[in-house]
Amino acid sequence: LDMPSGSFRTLEEALRRVFQMSVDKHMMFIIDDYPALVDTAPQVPILLRELMETYRDYGKMLVLLMGTHVDELKGRILGESSLIAPYIHSHFKVEPFTLDDVRALGWNYTDEDLAKLYHVTGGMPGNLVHIDPTESIDDNIVRLFFRPEGALYMEPQRLLMRYIRNAGAANAILYALAQLDKPFYTELCHASELKSGTFATRMADLLDMAIIGRLQGGSRGPLRYSDYHFVNTMFQFWFEYVFPYMEDIHCGDGQHVYDTIVKPVFTKNLSLVY
């Protein structure tokens, strides 16, 4: 793979060099977190629009823009205010793997271990890439979640802070949900200790991000009596077993937390993913 060489004084110089290379060869240009790039460099949509227009007829470039939160990505790319919407040919959402998809990876784990792995990663391909199949499931979990330098140790917080204005309120809701068994709306609001307006706004955010979901039972009456539950099992695992023990993990006691607190009771949640 030939990459642009040399140094570039500006982002514009680098982008122009990449697009110029596409005149002579077919290329795919991937921006891993487009919303974050635009937040850091607001001129990017203008540059991309100009370059896409300039090289539309003779460039051989496929540009792939990626992001974590689908609705925000759609707004940035496909919305009426998007500068590059006319150049977008298609969009798609990468769904979490199923448990069968994880089995198909061919890793030498038992079904119970694969269920653990699926639960802690939420089945997301971006999380599964951090799994080392030469290690035990327990060692993988400790390395990723129970060490301050772990690749997934702060991942739920990073996502909340990236896409929710008041991440502290979201933390309160998710921690309360992790302690309760499919609570009603009012039960969850009370447990979170948030004001009703703040609670309602953050609940809408979490539902929109598919971190939590609601299931209305036939005998439970109005929607406010729906059962609330985690949809993203990585968030469930994190708020149940990592969030309450972050101080211990920062002090280097993550292995002890996992061995004595998490591992003995962890399997009780595995029925959620079978």
Task: Name each region found by the language model.
Residues 2-12, 73, 247-258:
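Inter-domain helical "communication" segments and dimerization helices
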Residues 2-31, 36-37, 51-62:
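Mid-core helix/loop region of P-loop NTP-binding domains shared across ATPases and GTPases
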Residues 28, 36-81:
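Sensor-1/coupling segment of RecA-like P-loop NTPase cores
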Residues 36, 68-73, 98-100, 125, ...:
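Conserved nucleotide-binding/hydrolysis micro-motifs of P-loop NTPases
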Residues 81-87:
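Short, conserved catalytic or adaptor-binding loops enriched in Gly and charged residues
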Residues 88-114:
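Conserved small helical "lid"/interfacial subdomain of P-loop NTPases
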Residues 103, 118, 189:
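The alpha-helix within a helix-turn-helix
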Residues 127, 131-133, 137-274:
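Accessory nucleic acid-recognition modules appended to NTPase machines
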